[in-house]
């Protein structure tokens, strides 16, 4: 069969202008194959610029590319291998192996662009997925088949918390897909080795598009990981865990591509299609009657701004929002989750039960009141508080410290053994603190313990 080929007539950064025969223009979204001295790469058609010319974004390197280079229209969007052959493997945006092992057998390939599930196919039955992490299970529980966002600035512990969630939830069984979008190479390699050491790698696929790669790679690698998860849900009818680190880099890559195309940006320099791009991606992450996709996503906050357009565009799609705060990390409390800014749709009596709901509400009330009293304490000191308020402050600090926790993934750095706290032990500990059973204990006794059973 004759190949449909075109010729590159201009190169501007990662934007390629390509000339085809007038009757053979590739459709928007189709993949084009080109060669450089570094290897074979793909580009994606994003615009028809003339009667016989298209504009394409390079999903790969352009170093060594020249005008006159031939490109081949593959006649379909980027397709990646899915199914059992990619489990236990580390792949790039094309679904090619980057773990030093042979290429996965491409028995089944799916295009990375897919429609979201129909409304009648969605499964509305939800249950709680307990993580063993105290502050998450108490304040912002994760729904099985739901979407959870970890929001925070640089260096507050998002990736470590993500790795702990991967460790704890993967132990429960099932299939996992980890997608590294524009993150550091060492984080991907470190995660791969940890999964290998813990024995859960055979049920996990790692897909990486690193921060040194082109914006096209960083924009599309999230779809590669999602497509692999969708196949497990739809064809193998499995419950899947989808971890994405970092959604901000996905949005940022889209912004770079938009700028390369010469489109006018909106507030903050983001692309004008921000809401649609995020919506198209998030709407595909859904649970159907065949199986579920439980998604946990890191979202970087530029300058710690929770009102950044990238965060705002993501908020509305999430069931649980976990906000990490620098001021809590500065106190040496990890995970540095702010219980007052974090919330979950699952925190209601229907999902968690009346006891859990009431305890979480009391914890939030005490911590909120403590924040209000903090201004008085800073100016006048504890002596100016009433006896009741002093008691509340001490209990609030005990709760704040108690919500810290040693992690399994950081054992080798801290020398402290990680803990998985069962929900009954967690609720029992909170009840005892709220009831005043430990009013005589030092606040420091509650730092980095599991439950009340660890108090000596």
Swiss-Prot record:
It is found in: Cell membrane. GO terms for cellular component: plasma membrane; proton-transporting ATP synthase complex. Keywords: ATP synthesis, ATP-binding, Cell membrane, CF(1), Hydrogen ion transport, Ion transport, Membrane, Nucleotide-binding, Translocase, Transport. GO terms for molecular function: ATP binding; ATP hydrolysis activity; proton-transporting ATP synthase activity, rotational mechanism. InterPro entries: AAA+_ATPase, ATP-synt_VA_C, ATP_synth_F1_bsu, ATPase_a/bsu_AS, ATPase_alpha/beta_chains, ATPase_F1/V1/A1_a/bsu_N, ATPase_F1/V1/A1_a/bsu_N_sf, ATPase_F1/V1/A1_a/bsu_nucl-bd. Pfam families: ATP-synt_ab, ATP-synt_ab_N, ATP-synt_VA_C. It comes from the Bacteria. It catalyses: ATP + H2O + 4 H(+)(in) = ADP + phosphate + 5 H(+)(out). Gene3D superfamilies: 2.40.10.170, Bovine Mitochondrial F1-atpase, Atp Synthase Beta Chain, Chain D, domain 3, P-loop containing nucleotide triphosphate hydrolases. Its EC number is 7.1.2.2. It is a peripheral membrane protein. ATP binds at residues 152-159. Belongs to the ATPase alpha/beta chains family. Produces ATP from ADP in the presence of a proton gradient across the membrane. The catalytic sites are hosted primarily by the beta subunits. F-type ATPases have 2 components, CF(1) - the catalytic core - and CF(0) - the membrane proton channel. CF(1) has five subunits: alpha(3), beta(3), gamma(1), delta(1), epsilon(1). CF(0) has three main subunits: a(1), b(2) and c(9-12). The alpha and beta chains form an alternating ring which encloses part of the gamma chain. CF(1) is attached to CF(0) by a central stalk formed by the gamma and epsilon chains, while a peripheral stalk is formed by the delta and b chains. This is ATP synthase subunit beta 1. It comes from Listeria monocytogenes serotype 4b (strain F2365). The gene is atpD1.
């Amino acid at each position: 069969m004759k190949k449909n080929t075109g010729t590159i007539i201009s190169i501007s950064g990662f934007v390629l202008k390509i000339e085809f025969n007038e009757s053979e223009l590739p459709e928007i979204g189709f993949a084009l194959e080109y060669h450089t001295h570094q290897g074979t790469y793909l580009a994606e058609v994003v615009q028809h610029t003339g009667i016989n010319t298209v504009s394409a974004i390079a999903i790969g390197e352009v170093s060594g590319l020249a005008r006159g280079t031939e490109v081949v229209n593959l006649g379909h969007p980027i397709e990646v291998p899915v199914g059992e052959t990619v489990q236990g493997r580390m792949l790039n945006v094309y679904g090619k192996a980057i773990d030093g092992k042979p290429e996965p057998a491409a028995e089944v390939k799916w295009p990375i662009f897919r429609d979201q599930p129909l409304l009648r196919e969605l499964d509305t039955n939800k249950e709680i997925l307990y993580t063993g992490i105290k502050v998450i299970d108490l304040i912002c529980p994760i729904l099985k088949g739901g979407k959870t966002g970890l929001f925070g600035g640089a260096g507050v512990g998002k990736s470590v918390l993500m790795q702990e969630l991967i460790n704890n939830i993967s132990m429960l069984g099932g299939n996992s897909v980890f997608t590294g979008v524009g993150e550091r190479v060492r984080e991907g390699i470190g995660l791969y080795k940890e999964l290998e050491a813990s024995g859960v790698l055979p049920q996990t696929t790692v897909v990486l598009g690193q921060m040194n790669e082109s914006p096209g790679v960083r924009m599309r690698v999230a779809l590669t990981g999602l497509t692999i998860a969708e196949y497990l849900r739809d064809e193998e009818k499995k419950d899947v865990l989808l971890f994405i680190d970092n959604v901000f880099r996905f949005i940022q890559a889209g912004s770079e591509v938009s700028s390369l195309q010469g489109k006018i940006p909106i507030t903050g320099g983001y692309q004008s299609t921000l809401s649609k791009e995020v919506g198209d991606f998030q709407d595909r992450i859904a649970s159907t009657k065949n199986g579920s996709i439980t998604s946990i996503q890191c979202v970087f906050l530029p300058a710690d701004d929770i009102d950044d357009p990238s965060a705002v565009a993501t908020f509305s799609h999430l069931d649980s929002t976990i906000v990490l705060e620098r001021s809590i990390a500065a106190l040496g409390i990890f995970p540095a989750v702010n219980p007052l800014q974090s919330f979950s749709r699952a925190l209601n009596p229907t999902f968690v039960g009346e006891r859990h709901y009431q305890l979480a509400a009391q914890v939030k009330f005490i911590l909120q009141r403590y924040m209000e009293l903090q201004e008085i304490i800073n100016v006048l000191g504890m002596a100016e508080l009433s006896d009741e308020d002093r008691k509340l402050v001490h209990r609030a600090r005990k709760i704040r410290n108690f919500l810290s926790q040693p992690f399994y993934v950081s054992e080798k750095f801290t020398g402290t053994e990680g803990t998985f706290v069962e929900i009954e032990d967690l609720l029992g500990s909170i009840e005892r603190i709220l009831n005043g059973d430990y009013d005589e204990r030092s606040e420091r006794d509650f730092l980095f313990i599991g439950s009340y059973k660890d108090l000596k």
